[in-house]
Amino acid sequence: MIDMRTMAEEYARAYSDKTRIYFIEKYLSTFNADKGKKTQFMLFPRQKAFLRSIAEHGRSIAIKHRQAGITTTAGAFIACEIALADPESPITVLVIGNTIDLAMQMVTKIREFLFQIPLWFWDFELYKKDMESPINRKSALFKICNTKELILKNGCRVVARSSGPDASRGVGGVTWLIFDEAAFIENGKDVYASALPTVSTGGHVIMISTPNGKDQLYYETYRQAKACLLYTSPS
């Protein structure tokens, strides 16, 4: 059983590292295709560069090469942000995918990572109770828990939406706005324009995608990022 001093030291270390690299590699696991099972989440250099970018900049864009793990890394980062969020200032995450299934996949990744985080990060009283079963963990952490929406006891919220003019309807004060497969979103500029006003002051925007020609949203945003006009692209 972990003691209070160690808890405080670990929490302080995890909180102070805004990239969440320490948190992810220390406490989270992910599926390792080579070993055919879940293993400790050891980040690759490209994934670390991505985390440094989104931690440092308000707007970031990343190329998602096949099996690069960028979406998974983003999900792990968001889970860490939620676990470390101040209940007096909870975060809201809006995930917009080119399909609802894609957006739901990211919410599912976030949920799975949240379940991995030690209970004492949330509440020491929970840690002292018998919360090892998934049912107890679910009731302890979540008010709403499904593939389209997560609402946690600390006030944080994660919402999955498909792209469209109403993608952000009913969601405000967004702390993290994430576009997954942004290059494949139809009428991408319009979707972006309608969703951007939901982002709160100091909020962040992340675009992730595999390239899809010279589309109006992702390609143009990436081009501007390379020219240092708007977004930052991790190198």
Name the predicted role of every residue range.
Residues 1-233:
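Phosphate/NTP-binding elements of NTP-utilizing enzymes
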